[in-house]
From Swiss-Prot:
CDD domains: SelD. One of its GO terms (biological process) is selenocysteine biosynthetic process. Synthesizes selenophosphate from selenide and ATP. Binds 1 Mg(2+) ion per monomer. It comes from Shigella sonnei (strain Ss046). It catalyses: hydrogenselenide + ATP + H2O = selenophosphate + AMP + phosphate + 2 H(+). The lineage of its organism: Bacteria, Pseudomonadati, Pseudomonadota, Gammaproteobacteria, Enterobacterales. Keywords: ATP-binding, Kinase, Magnesium, Metal-binding, Nucleotide-binding, Selenium, Transferase. This is Selenide, water dikinase. Belongs to the selenophosphate synthase 1 family. Class I subfamily.
Length: 347
């Protein structure tokens, strides 16, 4: 079988960040007193569900450490590697940092898929690393039943510029740097529903590097930042609200969306991860139509950055975004928490 005819998505039961373990199950796995390692230099662990761990070196600089890997979300091997690497590196940018090196994580069904295809995957990962200005310095591989690829990435950040979920504040405006609908469009493609004019749109968005995060972190009024991935906008926004003790009001019409996404939702192109996300976070939402819920819970792979920005910094944030070719519009705001009200209200 040639590399051009291979369909990687047929060799896995999940796709991209949609194959994450559900938040409910993950909570059970992580719920342990022994998981609460006490080290005053560990600035960010897993308590607030942030994108990466952060360790203070004591000299004004902190180290960021993260890992991310998944099964194919596209059929093209090079694109799969590039997307997986871009997604992993994004965690460093979401914490306000600069990546400095990466190592690869590869699981490969050697009796089903040739090593030449695995090489294409790793070349895609290496390409993304070059885009981020870092080396793919090594890695580890295993014989697996399904193809898996990703990175463990190390970065650095000025300690005072670390961006965490828990540092969001009431009064902040919310901005999203990429459109939603990646899970929907990739599912539509698998179901042969995707229109010719929408071919390649999701791949282009997934390959777009969140490199602007390091520049956003230098803006005083950017209070919190996270990337929107497998738990969808609802999940990652809810975790920001829970960490900071605030609530969110979101303007649905202002949310950037991939072309055709609402039509594909009506046609049933909804990934399985959407239901898992709703089962974990749905109780935090107000009432809304099913199609709105399906978009907000849509698992994103290599999604955009979600920023919480004080109003006085809005113009500076938009100007910085424009330098990276990003057009920003506020999608909502954070407000003080009040009992009896949904954590995330959709208007």
């Amino acid at each position: 079988m040639s590399e051009n005819s291979i369909r990687l998505t047929q060799y896995s039961h999940g796709a991209g960040c949609g194959c994450k373990i559900s938040p409910k199950v993950l909570e059970t796995i992580l719920h342990s007193e022994q998981a609460k390692f006490v080290d005053p230099n560990l600035l960010v662990g897993n308590e607030t569900r942030d994108d990466a761990a952060v360790y203070d070196l004591g000299n004004g600089t902190s180290v960021i450490s993260t890992t991310d890997f998944f099964m194919p979300i596209v059929d093209n091997p090079f694109d799969f590697g590039r997307i997986a690497a871009t997604n992993a590196i994004s965690d460093i940018f979401a914490m306000g940092g600069k990546p400095i090196m990466a190592i690869a994580i590869l699981g490969w069904p050697i009796n089903k898929l040739s090593p030449e295809i695995a090489r294409e995957v790793t070349e895609g990962g290496r390409y993304a690393c070059r885009q981020a200005g870092i080396a793919l310095a090594g890695g580890h591989s295993i014989d697996a039943t399904e193809p898996i690829f990703g990175l463990a990435v190390t970065g650095i950040v000025p300690t005072e510029r670390v961006k965490k979920n828990s540092t969001a504040q009431a009064g902040c405006k919310l901005f999203l740097t990429k459109p939603l609908g990646i899970g929907v469009l990739t599912t539509a493609e698998k179901k042969s529903l995707l229109k010719p004019e929408h071919q390649g749109l999701a791949t282009e968005v997934m390959c777009r590097m969140n490199i602007a995060g390091a520049s956003f972190a230098n803006i005083e009024g950017v209070k919190a930042m996270t990337d929107v991935t497998g738990f969808g906008l609802l999940g990652h926004l809810s975790e920001m609200c829970q960490g900071a003790g605030v609530q969110a009001r979101v303007d649905y019409d202002a949310i950037p969306k991939l072309p055709g996404v609402e039509e594909y939702i009506k046609l049933g192109a909804v990934p399985g991860g959407t239901e898992r996300n709703f089962a974990s976070y749905g109780h935090l939402m107000g009432e809304m139509p099913r199609e709105v819920r399906d978009l907000l819970c849509d698992p994103q792979t290599s999604g955009g950055l979600l920023l919480a920005v004080m109003p006085e910094a809005e113009n500076e944030v938009k100007a910085t975004a424009a330098e990276f070719g990003i057009e920003l519009t506020a999608i909502g705001e954070l407000v003080p928490a009040r009992g009896g009200r949904a954590m995330v209200e959709i208007r």
